[in-house]
C-alpha cells in the first residue's frame, strides 16, 4: 500500500510474507482469518515479518510499526490535455474532500482551466463528502440536494459560496454504476447548468434510511425519505412493492431494452420532464441522472471472451506472475511513467500465457473474429495493470482511459468547448 507502514520500512510490491513474528504462515495449513489476526494489532505496536523477494536467496526480515493504513478514494489526478484536468473519484469517504482539494491544487498549479470529473463506477458513500465537493462548483445558496419524506421534514443542503472552482468548465462522466452520493454531485451540477454530464443513465440510488436495532442483535434499515436534485427530481429509481427480483434485475432490463447501447430506445413520459434552473434545459426524472451527452456501451470492444478471462481471474493472475518474474528489468527499463507510457508494449509471451491458461479452463472465443476484437482492449488492460504495479493507480487510469469512449468524449467536448 502506497505510503503505508510496510512501504516505509522497505517492503515492496511483489514481496511474499512467509512468517509473522517467527511463526510460519506459508506452506502450512492456516486459515486466512488466523493470518490476519497475527498481522493486525494496536496502532503503535510492532510486528516482525519474514519476506521472500524474487532474486534474493535468503528470507529478509522487517519490523513494521502498525499504523493506520491510508485508503484513498480519489483514484487518479492528472492533466489529460493542456489546460484540462482530470480527477477520478472511486467512492465518497471520510478523506475524499481532502484528497479532492489536494488534487485540484495540483492541477491548478499545472495550468488547469477546465475539469473532467470522472464518477464512473462510483457507488457513493458519505453524503457530507458529496456536498462538500459539489460546493466547490456552485455559488452561494445554490441548492445541492434535499431530502423529503412522508413524515420527515424537508432538509436542504446549500452551497456556501466559498468554492474554489466557480468559473471553469466542468464535465462529469457517469455510467450505469454511478450511484448515491455520486448522483447527488452529478444532479447538482446538471440542474444548475454548471457543467455537462456525459455517459449513460446512472444507477438510481437515493434512499435515506434509519438503522433500527432488533432485540436479537440483528438490524433493519427503514427508508424514511428520498434524495432529490435541485430541480425536484427523485434520484431513487422506482420499485414495485414486494417485487425484489424486478428491482434487482434493473441492469439486465436496461441492457435487454437497448438503453445502454442506443439513446433512441429511451423514452420518458411528459410527467418526468423537469427543467434546469439557469438555462431551463429539459432534463428527466424517473430515477438516476440522464446524461446531457449519451455515450453507448461498446459491446464490440467488451467481448464475452474478455469478460470470461476477467471473471476467472486469468488476466490479473497472469499479470501478477509477469510482474513478479520481470520486476527488476521493468524498473530498470522504465524508470519513469513517461518512459513506460511511450515505450512499453505488451509482449506476445504475456498474451500467449493468457491463451494457454484460458485453454486449460476451457474458455475460448467463439471464433477468430471475436479474438481479434478482444485483443486491443486486453492489451490496453494489461499495460494499465503493469503501470499500476510499477507506479500507482493514477497511472493505471492514464493508460486505460485511452480506450474509454466516455473519457474520450469528455476530452473531445472539453477541447472543443
Where are the regions a protein language model picked out?
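Acidic/polar loop patches that form or flank catalytic/metal-binding clefts of enzymes
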Residues: 145-146, 196-200, 230, 234-237, ...
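Extended catalytic-interface subdomain
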Residues: 210, 222-240
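Cleft-lining beta-strand/loop regions that shape enzyme active-site pockets
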Residues: 1-12, 18-24, 28-220, 226
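Active-site rim segments in enzyme catalytic domains, especially the processed small/beta chain
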Residues: 218, 224-225, 229, 245, ...
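Conserved functional hotspot residues or short segments at active or partner-binding sites
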Residues: 234-235, 239-417
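Generic structural signal for buried aliphatic residues
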Residues: 17-18, 47, 235, 283
Amino acid at each position: 500500500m502506497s505510503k503505508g507502514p510496510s512501504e516505509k520500512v522497505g517492503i515492496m510490491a511483489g514481496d511474499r510474507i512467509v512468517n509473522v513474528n517467527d511463526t510460519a504462515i506459508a506452506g502450512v495449513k492456516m486459515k486466512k482469518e488466523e493470518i490476519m489476526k497475527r498481522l493486525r494489532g494496536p496502532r503503535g505496536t510492532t510486528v516482525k515479518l519474514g519476506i521472500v523477494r524474487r532474486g534474493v536467496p535468503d528470507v529478509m526480515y522487517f519490523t513494521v510499526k502498525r499504523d493506520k493504513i491510508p485508503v484513498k478514494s480519489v483514484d487518479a489526478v492528472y492533466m489529460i490535455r493542456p489546460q484540462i484536468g482530470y480527477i477520478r473519484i472511486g467512492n465518497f469517504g471520510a478523506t475524499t474532500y481532502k484528497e479532492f482539494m489536494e488534487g485540484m491544487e495540483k492541477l491548478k498549479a499545472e495550468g488547469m482551466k477546465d475539469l473532467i470529473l470522472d464518477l464512473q463506477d462510483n457507488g457513493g458513500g458519505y453524503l457530507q463528502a458529496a456536498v462538500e465537493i459539489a460546493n466547490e462548483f456552485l455559488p452561494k445558496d445554490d441548492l445541492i440536494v434535499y431530502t423529503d419524506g412522508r413524515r420527515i421534514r424537508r432538509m436542504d443542503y446549500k452551497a456556501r459560496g466559498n468554492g474554489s472552482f466557480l468559473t471553469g468548465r466542468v464535465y462529469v462522466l457517469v455510467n450505469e454504476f454511478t450511484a448515491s452520493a455520486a448522483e447527488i454531485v452529478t444532479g447538482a451540477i446538471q440542474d444548475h447548468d454548471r457543467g455537462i454530464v456525459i455517459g449513460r443513465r446512472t444507477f438510481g440510488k437515493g434512499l435515506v434510511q434509519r438503522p433500527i436495532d432488533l432485540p436479537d442483535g440483528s438490524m433493519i434499515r427503514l427508508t424514511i425519505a428520498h434524495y432529490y436534485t435541485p430541480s425536484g427530481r427523485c434520484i431513487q429509481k422506482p420499485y414495485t412493492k414486494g417485487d425484489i427480483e424486478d428491482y434487482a434485475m434493473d441492469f439486465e432490463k436496461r441492457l435487454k431494452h437497448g438503453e445502454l447501447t442506443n439513446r433512441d430506445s429511451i423514452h420518458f413520459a411528459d410527467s418526468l420532464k423537469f427543467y434546469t434552473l439557469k438555462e431551463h434545459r429539459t432534463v428527466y426524472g424517473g430515477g438516476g441522472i440522464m446524461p446531457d451527452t449519451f455515450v453507448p456501451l461498446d459491446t464490440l470492444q467488451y467481448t464475452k471472451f474478455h469478460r470470461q478471462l476477467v471473471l476467472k481471474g486469468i488476466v490479473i493472475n497472469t499479470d501478477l506472475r509477469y510482474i513478479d518474474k520481470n520486476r527488476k528489468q521493468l524498473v530498470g527499463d522504465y524508470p519513469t511513467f513517461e518512459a513506460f507510457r511511450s515505450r512499453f508494449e505488451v509482449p506476445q509471451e504475456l498474451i500467449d500465457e493468457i491463451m494457454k491458461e484460458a485453454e486449460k479452463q476451457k474458455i475460448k472465443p467463439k471464433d477468430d473474429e471475436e479474438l481479434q476484437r478482444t485483443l486491443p482492449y486486453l492489451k490496453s488492460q494489461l499495460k494499465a495493470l503493469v503501470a499500476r504495479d510499477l507506479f500507482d493507480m493514477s497511472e493505471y487510469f492514464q493508460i486505460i482511459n485511452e480506450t474509454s469512449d466516455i473519457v474520450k468524449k469528455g476530452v473531445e467536448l472539453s477541447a472543443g468547448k
